[in-house]
Swiss-Prot record:
<feature type="domain" description="ApaG">
    <location>
        <begin position="3"/>
        <end position="127"/>
    </location>
</feature>
<dbReference type="InterPro" id="IPR036767">
    <property type="entry name" value="ApaG_sf"/>
</dbReference>
<dbReference type="Pfam" id="PF04379">
    <property type="entry name" value="DUF525"/>
</dbReference>
<dbReference type="InterPro" id="IPR007474">
    <property type="entry name" value="ApaG_domain"/>
</dbReference>
<protein>
    <recommendedName>
        <fullName>Protein ApaG</fullName>
    </recommendedName>
</protein>
<dbReference type="GO" id="GO:0070987">
    <property type="term" value="P:error-free translesion synthesis"/>
</dbReference>
<dbReference type="InterPro" id="IPR023065">
    <property type="entry name" value="Uncharacterised_ApaG"/>
</dbReference>
């Protein structure tokens, strides 16, 4: 599991290679990843936007930006957590992802929190992110 904490908001990520959705001969590899966001702070916050940087084993980088996550802009009161699962395809057998979420307090203050860099590994291309 990968973990980052910014302003007492913890983000953990657990990637999972999906061989049933992947094909080495077609150069299509697919992972799911489960993200848990836990608000250990004292303010209620809303997740506004996401920004992902996805890098494959060849060094090609793709950036993904958008509102919310999985169609939601969750609100987390102190002590609450939000969990979701999404997926990512790559044309190589390994890679990594990292990102940021823009959060907003009830007072309207916007700030960014880190999503920890995490490794996307498959049996065909084991690679570890240190």
């Amino acid at each position: 599991m990968y973990r980052a904490v910014t302003r007492r908001i913890e983000v953990t990520v657990e990637p999972n290679y999906l061989p049933e959705r992947s094909s080495a001969e077609n150069r299509q590899y697919f992972w799911s990843y489960t993200v848990v966001i836990t608000n250990s702070g004292e303010e209620t916050v809303k997740l506004r936007t996401r920004h992902w940087v996805i890098t494959d084993a060849s060094g090609r980088t793709q950036e993904v930006r958008g509102e919310g996550v999985v169609g939601e802009q969750p609100v987390l009161a102190p002590g609450e957590r939000f969990e979701y699962t999404s997926g990512v395809p790559l044309p190589t057998a390994s890679g990594f992802m990292a990102g940021r979420y823009q959060m907003e307090t009830e007072a309207g203050e916007k700030f960014e929190i880190d999503v920890p860099p995490f490794s996307l590994d498959s049996p065909e291309g084991k690679r570890t992110l240190n």
